[in-house]
Amino acid sequence: GLTAADKTLIKSIWGKVEKETEAIGVEALVRLFKCFPQSKVYFDHFTDLSPSSQKLHAHAKVVLGALTKAVNHLDNITDTLHDISLVHAKKLLVDPVNFELLGHCLEVALAAHFATDFTPEVHLAIDKFLYEVEKALFETYR
Amino acid sequence: VHWTETERATIETVYQKLHLDEVGREALTRLFIVYPWTTRYFKSFGDLSSSKAIASNPKVTEHGLKVMNKLTEAIHNLDHIKDLFHKLSEKHFHELHVDPQNFKLLSKCLIIVLATKLGKQLTPDVQATWEKLLSVVVAALSREYH
């Protein structure tokens, strides 16, 4: 699980992320759709998936908002994301592999925006955090 | 695998910006730190337990360069990647006994190193092209497993 050192590193870089959550969220999603186009099947109702799409911007804010909540509740990510897990598990029926793909795209966005801060140690801490998020999202699937 | 002119140009443009020994070493460093179980294949390299130890380990730099040199060959032979990696695939299966999942992990680390080097220049489209390149290499390396 997350060590005290991990939590410090996660909160530290997230402080920088919080200054531009919408931009980073949009970038992560655009990277997801370009690199892993199969993920677009869950967004037929968006019609426009370009970086200027209003719906995409709104969704990016929702996603990053949930991640920020998780960062603020690192000791209880499972409960924090319970309702979001239910939506993905029962309503949206999103294949969980997509959480890993979006996680990777978010890490690429962080590495591109915060090159000097995204050290191997910070990379490890964020990767561990996103794994906890993925587990929490999968919690209500079956 | 079909490569468009844009993809070919994108691959070459990014490649020209890279310092191969640096990128190779940094990708392996992230692999060993973020996915520490991958060190199982490198017991002969000595201490790989921390960023500091890995950074000063000449065997890591040497191996990183080996990997990047092979990737260079792939980049300059995009239409023959399967053949190019035939022997290396056999070696990883029969001799080195490497779980192919490790190829995917190293690919993820390499893309992240590219992001730290290129910043905004690693646009979603550029990333997509390099993800495609690495997935083709990974498939070629996994091909002779049976």
From Swiss-Prot, chain A:
UniProt entry keywords in alphabetical sequence: Heme, Iron, Metal-binding, Oxygen transport, Transport
Entry keyword Heme: yes
Expression tissues: Red blood cells.
Top-rank taxon, per record: Eukaryota
GO biological process: hydrogen peroxide catabolic process
Family under the similarity heading: Belongs to the globin family.
Quaternary assembly: Heterotetramer of two alpha chains and two beta chains (an easy dimerization is also reported).
Protein name in the entry: Hemoglobin subunit alpha
From Swiss-Prot, chain B:
Pfam families reported in the protein's UniProt record: Globin
InterPro entries: Globin, Globin-like_sf, Globin/Proto, Hemoglobin_b, Hemoglobin_oxygen_transport
GO cellular component terms, A-Z: blood microparticle; haptoglobin-hemoglobin complex; hemoglobin complex
Residue ranges of domain Globin in the record: 2-146
Binding-site positions, heme b: 63, 92
Keyword set, alphabetical order: Heme, Iron, Metal-binding, Oxygen transport, Transport
Chain's role: Involved in oxygen transport from the lung to the various peripheral tissues.
Name of the protein in question: Hemoglobin subunit beta
Gene it is expressed from: HBB
